[in-house]
Amino acid sequence: MQPLLLEIGSEEIPAGYIVPALEALAQALDAKLESARIAHSKPKVYGTPRRLAVILDEVAEKQESVTTEMVGPPKSVAFDGEGKPKVPAVKFAEKAGVAVEELTFQETEKGVYLCAKIQDEGKETLGILQEMLPEIISHIPFPKSMRWAALPGTFARPVFSILALLGDQVIPFEWNGVTTGRQTRGHYFMAPEAIDIQTPSEYVNALEKAKVIADIPTRRKMVKEGVDAIAKELGGDAIEDEELVDIVANLVEFPAPVGGKFETGFLEVPDKVLITAMREHQKYFAIQDKDGKLMPCFVAVNNTQCKDPQLVATGHERVLRARLSDAKFFWDVDKKQSMEDWVKRLDRVLFQKKLGSVGEKVARVEEMAKFLAAAPEINGDPDKAQKAAHFCKADLVSGLVIEFTKLQGVMGKAYASLAGMDAETASALEEHYLPAYSGGPLPRTKTGDAVAMADKMDSLCGCFAVGLIPSGNRDPYALRRQGIGVIRILQEKGYSLSLSAIVDKGLTLVKDKADQNLAETRDKIISFLADRMAHMLAEQGFSKDVIQAAVAISCDDIPYLWKRVAAVEKLKTLPDYEALAQTFKRVANIIKQAAEKGTLSDQEVNPALFEKDCEKDLLEAFTAMEAKVSGLGVDEALLEVAKLRPAVDAFFDDVMVMAEDMKVRENRLALLAGIAGLFGRFADFSRISA
């Protein structure tokens, strides 16, 4: 076994590209070595803005040997009566690369056939890597790639070196004009000299001596600890921002934090504006005091250790002062504007070519928000919801949001509060964008819930109505995320509001823009949302068959769907679950088949047609159970329904459902239909694996 190292040296790669590229590099190398029958250890990745690297501590020096069998022509065709080889035998031996004398015979169902055993001793790993590694480099995915110097290959940024070692040997190949070697380079400013790497085990330590921290978790830890330490020196704590730590860790090769300050006058601007200005443009960490109040100072992370930190801090302060001055200017100008004037300007802002302006969207969202807030299941304030919806997009044309787009909603709330709007309505202007990401926080108020769902459902219904349906990786209007947002609000807030009623309302509001059949569009939207629900339930650990069985009944009441799935999943923990599922499934299948054949009537069960006591016993048990479960919760109700199994099993043991007497048959089917309807409230048990 030998260690393997591949490092691709390049110009500075964007921070967000590095981790996904390293994951793809490791996966590709792992898969290709496996496919090539080369034993190896797990890949370990290293990366900085100027290099992507992978190390495997152990790689076999040769492919694994394998023996394969090749079946040839029938013996009767390949040999004559005296056992001498004929042309087919000779040709087969040549094809297999063996002598005729080495051929064997194999008994098959079709007779005796020639067989050749082919021994593949395996090639040297070094030679295989010469072909494998260039291909892997060529296929590392990036959001955007580029070409340079009229060369054919593409990469995130121009590649200037490739370090490739197997043990102490250079793996010789050329990629896009760059020939491999054993050299890497240290920090661009602090140690720019070339470094010879003799074996992969030297790599990480050699770079560290040259002021490059190649290991991302180590570099990330240095960023976080350094920022926290500087913040303490400034008398506060860095505002927690794990995403910013990730970004900064991949902007530098050797983190060197430094603290700075800004004028207290800027604190007149809302905290989120200042934090966003520091974060988005400068990648600075904001600092707060022990009471959570923003302090007029920050931490910047340099890529170079400096002799005079104060001089560097002064430079950062000068740059930030310009940014904060811009933010304060926009804040002061925006405060003098009328939000109603901004709403009018939305008529000149395009939402989508077929769906019209943002102003038109806002008008639809107002109606939908009012409808949702008025629903008994939500029991909100329709007037507040309509007012919040009216102003929910107003800040999109404000100076601050145009400059800092991530402040949409945040500034809406701030401007509404300045204008004297009540707290719940003002908060809804920010909350209506929630949840902003998978697992993100939900709106905190009913008004926020109503406007958030209204905005998302308008986008869903509108886009589907004009044929803009997500497919594959294409989802330009983030409809999957918006659908999940609606589902989460309904489910986690316990709003048993009819999903189909919401979709119907949304399509009614957008019908004048639609160019698709609305009935078909309705079905597509509900199916789309049902798929999202199934995916969410699967992520929560529920069984696929249980999810499908519950969704097949209905997904109109989303909180109830979650309860049904949980109840059926709980049923699977019972000792007699398999027998129970078989019984329920048998009943469901009989009723389904009868319905498909048209032999299922809607008649009531007639006890006078009973021929056996088990029929009477089952009806009595069913009638008592139906009354009992009506007041129970989903879990208890399903567990009670499960107690019908002995009576159902006795029924199946003692009678033939499909009796020759048509009236008796229909009566028994009616009895089973009642049973199926009782447990069919929870799931379609015909879909559940027993």
UniProtKB/Swiss-Prot annotation:
BP-aspect Gene Ontology terms: arginyl-tRNA aminoacylation; glycyl-tRNA aminoacylation
EC number(s) reported in the record: 6.1.1.14
Enzyme class, broadest EC rank: ligase
GO CC term (a single one): cytosol
InterPro entries documented for this protein: DALR_anticod-bd (IPR008909), Gly-tRNA-synth_bsu (IPR015944), Gly-tRNA-synth_heterodimer (IPR006194)
Reaction equation(s) it catalyzes: tRNA(Gly) + glycine + ATP = glycyl-tRNA(Gly) + AMP + diphosphate
Gene Ontology molecular functions: arginine-tRNA ligase activity; ATP binding; glycine-tRNA ligase activity
Stated name of the protein: Glycine--tRNA ligase beta subunit
Taxonomic source organism: Desulfatibacillum aliphaticivorans
